[in-house]
């Protein structure tokens, strides 16, 4: 008998972000060089959003990256600072390119954002459709225009943003935490 066990996070590690919503919004992406092409796929989104909102881009990664003309920071990923680095992000971005390879991705980064109290915006493709319900616990987007609109909605609508944060954390606690899945392992 085969049983699917989803990505599972230790919520004792992934504490909720508690800081106030800033005037300058930090859009964040986390990933390695092997997933750089996903970040490249939303470059235009970042430049477009910068026309409407006061933003900073936070990239948590293992490689150098340039976003000339934008306010951005590259933070080297380290396990010891992973959570505190994630807490520098206000909106988490999880872009994918629609390929067979991407279908196999488990959506871990989006789940990490959700667990940490960071609203997640993801490409409407693959596994994320199993755990993100659009405008309830995150956003699923298909185009540059939808990326931009979702970022603006999260930034400008406090009630929606707060509901997404609460619902996202509940989703992870209920279905994607170690404690919710431990019986499946044993």
What feature does the model see in each segment?
Residues 1-15:
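Donor nucleotide-sugar binding/catalytic pocket of nucleotide-sugar-dependent glycosyltransferases
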Residues 10-14, 20-88:
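Conserved catalytic-core segment of nucleotide-activated headgroup transferases in glycan assembly
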Residues 87-88, 115, 133:
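Flexible glycine/serine/alanine-rich "lid" or loop that lines and gates the nucleotide-sugar donor pocket
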Residues 94, 112-115, 119-122:
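Short hydrophobic beta-strand element within catalytic cores of glycosyltransferases
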Residues 94-103:
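Short Ser/Thr-rich beta->loop micro-motif in glycosyltransferases that lines
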Residues 104, 124-135, 139-140:
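Short acidic/histidine- and often glycine-rich active-site loop of Leloir-type glycosyltransferases
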Residues 134-145, 153-159:
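Conserved acidic donor-binding segment of nucleotide-sugar-dependent glycosyltransferases
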